[in-house]
Each structure stands twice: as C-alpha cells, then as structure tokens.
C-alpha cells in the first residue's frame, strides 16, 4: 500500500515572535484523501509549537514520543529533541519511521529529521515537506525585503507553496508564540 505523504510546514522567527504553519492536505498516491488535516499543534501547555510532515502514522508516533521527552526534560526543547534523536537512531522500529518535525518555543526553533538529526536552522526560517523548498525560499525573500510579522510571512510562504506544489493546499493552520 502507498504511504500518505505531501505537505508543507514552515516556521519563521523575528524578534520575540515565532510562527509555525502548515497546510491541511493529506495525499495517498495521486488522490487527496483529506484537505483539512491539522499538522501544526501546540503542546506542553501551549509553550511549544510542533509541525510534522511525512507519513501520518509515523508523525503521530514521533509527536507522542516528543511530548513525553518534553515532559521528562521539563520543557527544555533542545534536550527533548536530542534525546528523541538518540532514540530515533538507536531503535530499530523508530529508524523506519518516515516523518520530520519542526519544533519551536520562545527561544529556539529545531528541525528533527528522518535520519535522527537535530538542526538549528539559519536565519530563523525552517521548512519541511514536499513544498518546503518553495515555502523556505518565499519566507527568506520576505524576511530579507519586508518588515512583515512572522505570522504574515508564514501565511504568504504557504500560499506560494500551495500554488506551486501539488501536495500542498491553502487550508492553513498557523500558530504563534511571543
């Protein structure tokens, strides 16, 4: 059976604000199965934002594990992400998971990759998923040439990705932290 795939998740940080957004499309092969999925969430009492791309079941499995790590490390995003990455690399079942996460709190944005890497993106911009390159390019241009708020940059970047990537729609969920 084919895997569910395709989405765009993008995060932008400027000053004391961070925004994380994603589209709502879930695709199975060349069929849109759902257009209103919620791939961006607030976790850890609303203090951490997380967005996921990749296989839906795998992403939920990772999200559950990440939430447990946040609890274990009392909300320390970096320690939770690194510990999740260690598990991801060393556990046979986890190594097979096909998903990626972007996580953000008030101070830090991290990308947790399908290889178990934890990346701190440059320039306050991170994007993943099938439309990630489009969204990241758009966000970078907007951040360098406008004074738009992070939420507005995320919305415009997702709109552009939705126009270019067939696996991305324009039903957005955008969350912010200040």
Swiss-Prot record:
> Which residues carry out catalysis?
7
Cellular compartments annotated: Cytoplasm
EC identifiers of the protein = 3.4.25.2
Q: Name one GO cellular component term.
A: proteasome core complex
UniProt record, GO biological process: proteolysis involved in protein catabolic process
For this protein, the record's InterPro entries field holds: ATP-dep_Prtase_HsIV_su, Ntn_hydrolases_N, Proteasome_sua/b, Proteasome_suB-type
Catalytic function, reaction form: ATP-dependent cleavage of peptide bonds with broad specificity
UniProt GO MF annotations: metal ion binding; threonine-type endopeptidase activity
- Binding residue positions for Na(+): 162, 165, 168
Q: Name the domain of life.
A: Bacteria
Task: Write the signal peptide boundaries.
Answer: none
HAMAP family from the UniProt entry: HslV
Record's PANTHER family? ATP-DEPENDENT PROTEASE SUBUNIT HSLV (PTHR32194:SF0), METALLOPROTEASE TLDD (PTHR32194)
Q: How does it assemble?
A: A double ring-shaped homohexamer of HslV is capped on each side by a ring-shaped HslU homohexamer. The assembly of the HslU/HslV complex is dependent on binding of ATP.
Q: Which NCBIfam families match?
A: ATP_dep_HslV (TIGR03692), PRK05456.1 (NF003964)
The record's function comment reads: Protease subunit of a proteasome-like degradation complex believed to be a general protein degrading machinery.
Similarity section: Belongs to the peptidase T1B family. HslV subfamily.
Q: What is this protein's record name?
A: ATP-dependent protease subunit HslV
What organism is this sequence from? Cupriavidus taiwanensis (strain DSM 17343 / BCRC 17206 / CCUG 44338 / CIP 107171 / LMG 19424 / R1) (Ralstonia taiwanensis (strain LMG 19424))
| Gene name in the database record | hslV
